Amino acid sequence: MQKLCSTLVILSISLLTIGQKISVLDKLTSKKLIGEGKELFYAGRVSEAMLTFKRAKLKNPLSGEACYQLGVAQFYLRSYYNAYENINNAEILLSKKQDGEYYYDVGRIFHSVNKIDSAKLFYTLAAKELGPRISKDYDLDILLEQCDFVKNQESQNIQNICKPFSRAVNSKYDEYGAILLYDKKRLLFTARQPETTGNNINDNDQKFFEDIYRADWNEQLQDWKINIPAMEEYNTEGFDALNFISRDGTYGLLTINTSATVEKSTSSSEIYEFETDEEDSSWYIDPIRSESINTSYFEGAATISDTSFDEDETATQTMVFVSDRRSDKSLTDLYVAQRIDDKWSEAKPILELNTLGRETTPFITADGRFLFFSSDALPGMGGYDVYYSEWVNESWSKPTNLGASINTVNDDTHFQYFPEIKTGTISSIHDFDGYFSYDIFSFDLSNSDFPFVNQ
């Protein structure tokens, strides 16, 4: 397939160049547009940059620089197949030796479409050009390890077992954080769709704000049916994400951020909890009141164990969440706090698991024995991978990658496991009619030998 794609690209370039002349004016205009596109890109306006690079390529289809810059912008917008096509064009059209950043970008694009041998080649070239110190800043050692990890998984013929939910819930927009309730009859998840409350768009990524969605299984249709009114009173005009619900559906944890709206009930992302009304099952939502949990930094993606009782009948729950309060030393970290007889202990970083990169979307089993999370700085397939750790001798064990049966070469997050039905859910970057976005998946672990399944 890779040879076929390369052949088609070469053929398309050859056909393009036959008898074609690019005027000096068009070349100059293309160069000017590339400069404008770079300014937009570095200002974080990637969508506008991508359109500008497209115009540059139209003016001069033989500009390798236009193809390269367009491919990079498309990569950041998760248009991976288009990025792959344009970066192949750039490789053919650019005759001069390139710098390390170019090789790094090409490697990332090949990695995103699972062209691992090519990705490793360009990562190696990038490391050679950039040198040891700068290569570390680009995480090239991690990226090369990821290539080796993928090849190892391929050599074992490990098949991915994740199956996407239907298009009744998955779309070209982002869906993530799937939670199953009531014997798989109810599905709750978070999405960034045009119907979001307030119709607000995030300036940073030009995507809609988050809302919580509910879908119920329809026996007649044999499919999910979204129930929009069910969540209307809980979604704000800000960011609303559901992170955890107890198995009986009576308690849950959310991440809410209204700092960018007129509501401004939060100063940043904060962790909220809810309990359901016994009569009508409505949610009573309140922020967790602890200065060491909710701070002025980002806090969210919380998960919590069931209540355990010691010999003195002290009630204890363990909550794990994500914060960027140590952003001067790392990006996002996992933190743990205990609720002991309804009082919160001081939140502390989980030093055994945190890296200099990003740890996110934890999930703790009901008994508190296993902790799952995603990281982009541990040995894995690429992007975020899902790992698990076991609580042994009063500390968390070395993280174990769930492998290619669950993870992919792109981002995999929001893992949850439901032992009563031996089913898990995950969110992954997925191809939806040529457009890559977060979709929600489920997988059956009935025949799995993972230790958390057979405990």
Please give the residue ranges for each predicted region.
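Alpha-helical segment of the N-proximal tetratricopeptide repeat
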Residues: 26-59
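Short coil turns that delineate tetratricopeptide repeat
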Residues: 27, 61, 95-97, 131
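Start-of-helix register in tetratricopeptide repeats
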Residues: 31, 65, 99-101
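Conserved structural position within tetratricopeptide repeats
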Residues: 55-58, 89-92, 128
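Short, conserved micro-motifs composed of acidic
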Residues: 69, 76, 105, 112, ...
